[in-house]
Amino acid sequence: MSSKITIIGAGSVGATIAYTLSSQDIASEIVLIDINKQKAEGEVLDIIQGTCFRDPISIIAGDYEDAKDSDIVIITSGIARKPGQTRLELTQTNVNILKSITPEIVKAAPNALYLIVSNPVDIMTYVFTKISGLPENQILGSGTILDSARLRCGLSEHFQIAQSNIHAYVFGEHGDTSFIPWSGAYISGVSVDEYYELEKKLGKDIEPIDKEAMLQYVQKSGGEIISKKGATFYAVSSSVCKLCSLLVSYSESISTVSTMMHGEYGIEDVCLSTLTLVGPNGVQGKVPMRMNKAEIEQLKKSADALKEIIAQIDLN
């Protein structure tokens, strides 16, 4: 596929995204940029030496000017939370990094679609939207794409059914106040509860879904992986690359990306994840999903939690 994708940040996530893109025929050109140029060069060399087994692709460790004419820019820069560091301290540190990156990359690639992956992703997407000066359709965060994938994985394991038959999503922030709007969760065209009853009638030995446990599975998976191997990067990279394939394709699709809210569900001036139509022109608009009153309140609670953090950070 003839597209140019620039990745800022050659850490575990950025490098794995570069590798995954190189193996999936999504991009014909990849530029990897990092403040540690030697690290980026090493990652690129490692990836290039495996490309002889695949279709030809151009991969370089570059600078901001090399991002010119990029179709997509993926921002993964940031640091992980340190022991004793508060969430607000981490947020401000990563916001400062984003503020230092934004002018140069936007100058080099003003027409690109920008995919924010750095955490806390909803706040970073909000900050980039405010400081970049770009149209909002060009900006989206990875949001709860991975959370939604984890949900489908959990439901697939529980019901022993292919994930392609499951349509269920995680809304809100990519974090502690995320939630599952079960009103819009379906398996093969019927609600999750109805599907359970159907399975029981067919004589399947199956337990009903513990919805709170499923939410905990979604929210705690990242922490469990980090505690066991130190970082998460395979699943998030797969999620990001899937989104990139949508952004460079000729069709549109619905995804739970983080975008600016403008009154949907009574929420304004914050970025979080709901159903959003995305395609080659970026963000096309929100797709309303029927939710009950309690679920709408959960979404507002998530928005309020994000706004509380935003109110305390320095954007100047």
Indicate where each model-derived feature is located.
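Extreme N-terminal starter segment of soluble prokaryotic enzymes
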Residues: 2-5
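Conserved N-terminal Rossmann-fold NAD(P) cofactor-binding segment
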Residues: 29, 33-71, 85, 308-312
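Conserved S-adenosyl-L-methionine
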Residues: 23-29, 133-135
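N-terminal Rossmann-fold NAD(P) dinucleotide-binding loop
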Residues: 14-15
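C-terminal substrate-binding/catalytic lobe of Rossmann-fold NAD(P)-dependent dehydrogenases
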Residues: 132-138, 148-316
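Glycine-rich Rossmann-fold phosphate-binding loop(s) that bind the pyrophosphate
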Residues: 10-11
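Rossmann-like NAD(P)(H) cofactor-binding subdomain of soluble oxidoreductases
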Residues: 86-153
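Rossmann-like NAD(P)-binding element
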Residues: 52-112
